[in-house]
Design a protein with these regions (language model features):
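Short, small-residue-enriched loops and turns at beta-alpha junctions
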Residues: 13-14, 35-39, 66-69, 123-124, ...
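Active-site phosphate-binding strand-loop segment of PLP-dependent enzymes
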Residues: 5-61
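Pyridoxal 5′-phosphate
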Residues: 1, 9, 13, 31-34, ...
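Conserved PLP-binding catalytic core of the aspartate aminotransferase-like
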Residues: 152-196, 205-206, 210-214
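A short linear hydrophobic-aromatic micro-motif
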Residues: 92, 124, 198-204
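Active-site C-terminal subdomain of aminotransferase-like
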Residues: 21, 55-58, 65, 70-171
């Protein structure tokens, strides 16, 4: 039998708790992004972890947009919240965002990794990364962990941009500018492009209708 998938509203911990109460006695896996790619906000990892521990659910976090950008040294949402000693049960990261390469990794217990190696079709039926890709990822991680890490400069640039735009200081490099009207967002993106700025307009179905952003 396949798993039953239930979606809880974005950031609504009360709704998630109600779902976990209803599913009491069943095996549950809570899945969330670490950094939400459209608005740059962070998942409330400490609260999610506490809820999952209380109800015996496992927690999986996709930190694709966190690795290399979030946390003092770019180690992602776990570092941002200081939860290195209590990480999610499954942490997924990618090499195709901040690291500028390809591939990804699943960080979990030995038993979970063993199960994935045997049963996860995307792993079983995928070709391994090429040596060149592996070398690029290794080099990117070395830079991230080295004395000349670009992460502090990234954080300063994000703060500077947010301040100049009149926005609150932002925890991630994804800084959304609300426009609302889709045509206006597309026009603004076009005009920015003519001035040499690549600022995509995000509109439905990527974001809800009439809530377009840059």
């Amino acid at each position: 039998h396949g798993a039953e998938v239930t979606v809880f509203p974005h950031g609504d911990l009360a709704a998630l708790q109600a779902m976990l109460v209803e599913a009491s006695g069943q095996r549950c896996l809570v899945v969330t992004d670490g950094v939400f790619s459209m608005d740059g906000t962070l998942a409330p990892l400490p609260e999610l972890t506490e809820l999952c521990r209380r109800f015996g659910a496992a927690l999986m976090v996709d930190d694709a947009h966190g690795l290399g950008t979030v946390g003092a040294t770019g180690r992602g949402i776990v570092e941002h919240f200081g939860m290195q000693q209590d990480p999610p049960d499954v942490l997924v990261v990618t090499g195709s965002k901040a690291l500028g390469a390809e591939g990804g990794a699943v960080l979990a217990s030995e038993s979970v990794i063993a199960m994935l190696r045997q049963r996860a079709r995307p792993y079983v039926y995928s070709t391994a990364p090429s040596p060149a890709v592996c070398a690029a990822l290794t080099a990117a991680l070395d830079i991230l962990n080295g004395p000349n890490s670009p992460v502090p400069d990234l954080h300063r640039n994000v703060d500077r941009m947010a301040t100049r735009l009149g926005l609150d200081t932002w925890p991630t490099p994804i800084v959304p500018v609300a426009v609302g009207d889709e045509a206006s967002a597309v026009q603004a993106a076009h005009e920015l492009g003519e001035q040499g700025w690549f600022v995509p307009a995000m509109r439905w179905p990527t974001v809800p209708r009439s809530r377009a952003i840059l």
